[in-house]
Amino acid sequence: RLVGSEMCIRDRSKYKIMTPGPVQVPENVRLARSLSTTNADLDPQFFDEYKETCELISELLHTKNETLILSGEGILGLEAACASMTEPGDRVLILDNGIYGAGFADFVSMYGGIPVMYTKDYKNAFDVDELDAYLKEDHDFKYATVVHCDTPSGMLNDIHKICPLLKSYGIMTVTDSVSGMFGNEVNVDKAQIDILCGGSQKAVSAPPGLTFVTISDEAKKAMENRKT
């Protein structure tokens, strides 16, 4: 609030943020953000720093896939992935056992795709054998969406079993690991994940506003071969 010509700023240093995100930002990170910056598009050094940071994220996620950092909260990566992968009429399998799992259907529909819901109890992780039985009956999907950790419930799905199973049926994967990566092990290459999305405001313990996306060569090819 404003008092006269002076702004009164409440001291929040005594508070501890215990929400699942945005999380408490460490003091050294907060201080680093207070340093002077340049215009990224005019600073040649920024491109080297950006590339190095992307490579470090790839290393942490155990992948040779390209990593990009986007300016926006984690949900930006989820929509960007669906927007880039979906063409009108594409059937997309939505693995739904949580709020964010179900939310993928909206993104797919927005870009003309046909979301096919595979819905399970929100209190239980996906059973890989049950999913396999389902896929034996219907696996005609361009890609599938899966949430690693669904933030509201804390539901943790085993992406290291789910994604390889989907790949065995020729189905690419878009994986939401916004609240999973760096808090739980993620080995992108071992799990054969095509697109993995994360965010800065969860286990990275940074402020909100950045999205991390890793993209496989197969996913890039699908994007390049779009007809629309």
Locate each region found by the language model.
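Single conserved hydrophobic/aromatic residue that forms the stacking wall/gate
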Residues: 1-9
